[in-house]
């Protein structure tokens, strides 16, 4: 009888113990903590330069499941991800209005700066898929990143009402102003991180139909799958909240030299464009 009990119930107990190892630490940190808006001081990004062969992994391989150090590290990652899921983004956005962090007062030095991640996207003008880093390499780039209508609106504020030669400029509506950036070797790259291919096609079709994105912006306006960047990668860029919008100043070597999010303040707009033309 005792042998029968072990035969039928021991595997179940083992599985429960295995799951318990994962669930306990996750549940302990699952309740959202009071969000604090802090100023960026340390560089953000990845330590490895992006390559076309780069693929960011999410989770552990079967072999890693038997490595206690890697397993414990993954459990901690999952705990953070779990604590920031569901209504967390909504609650934080409502509280901060998308201002998840305050931009640094100066740009990060080249030897300290970290890299913008590898990303594949399709330009709105219908060209084939390409690596975003190929577009960034060799130019100073201002990358506008968003996933929702609110993020689109917030991130647009960094390009509107820019004072240049004593007049206000809008780099998203004025083609001549956009073209003039070439004189400073500066370009604007727009990235719409979408959840899936169906949504991507819908976004592209509606944007064209509404003539929201003029033809001169379309070669630099990309739809990219958000799934290419796992939670951990987005966390390194401080861009996990889908409701906000983000701006990254990326140098010619693909390093992030400055970043901002939410609606632009006058000082942030001034800093962004001053830094962009200085790099």
From Swiss-Prot:
This protein's GO CC annotations = cytoplasm; mitochondrial inner membrane; mitochondrial membrane; mitochondrion
Task: Kindly list the biological process annotations in GO that this record carries.
Answer: mitochondrial proton-transporting ATP synthase complex assembly
> Is ATP-binding given among the entry's keywords?
no
Query: Where is it located?
Result: Mitochondrion inner membrane
Superkingdom: Eukaryota
Q: Where's it mainly located?
A: mitochondrion
Other notes: Mutations in ATP10 induce a loss of rutamycin sensitivity of mitochondrial ATPase.
Q: Which family does it belong to?
A: Belongs to the ATP10 family.
The protein's name is Mitochondrial ATPase complex subunit ATP10
List the top taxonomic levels of the source.
Eukaryota, Fungi, Dikarya, Ascomycota, Saccharomycotina
Q: Which gene encodes it?
A: ATP10
């Amino acid at each position: 009888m005792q042998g029968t009990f072990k035969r039928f119930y021991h595997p179940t107990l083992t599985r429960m113990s295995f799951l318990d190892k994962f669930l306990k630490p996750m549940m302990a940190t699952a309740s959202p903590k009071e969000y604090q808006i802090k100023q960026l001081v340390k560089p953000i990004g990845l330590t490895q330069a992006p390559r076309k062969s780069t693929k960011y992994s999410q989770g552990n391989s079967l072999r890693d499941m038997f490595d206690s150090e890697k397993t414990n590290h993954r459990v901690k990652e999952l705990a953070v991800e779990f604590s920031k899921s569901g209504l967390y983004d909504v609650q934080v956005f409502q509280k901060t209005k998308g201002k998840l962090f305050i931009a640094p007062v100066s740009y990060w030095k080249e030897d300290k700066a970290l890299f913008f991640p590898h990303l594949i996207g399709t330009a709105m003008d219908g060209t084939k898929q390409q690596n975003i880093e190929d577009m960034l390499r060799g130019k100073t780039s201002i990358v506008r990143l968003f996933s929702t209508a609110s993020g689109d609106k917030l991130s647009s504020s960094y390009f509107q009402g820019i004072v240049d030669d004593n007049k206000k400029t809008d780099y998203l509506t004025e083609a001549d102003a956009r073209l003039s950036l070439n004189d400073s070797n500066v370009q604007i790259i727009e990235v719409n991180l979408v959840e899936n291919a169906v949504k991507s096609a819908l976004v592209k079709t509606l944007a064209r139909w509404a003539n929201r994105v003029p033809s001169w912006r379309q070669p630099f306006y990309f739809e990219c799958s958000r799934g290419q960047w796992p939670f951990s990668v987005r966390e390194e860029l401080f861009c996990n909240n889908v409701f906000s919008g983000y701006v990254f100043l990326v140098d010619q070597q693909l390093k992030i030299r400055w970043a901002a999010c939410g609606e632009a303040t006058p000082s942030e707009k001034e800093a962004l464009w001053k830094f962009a033309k200085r790099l």
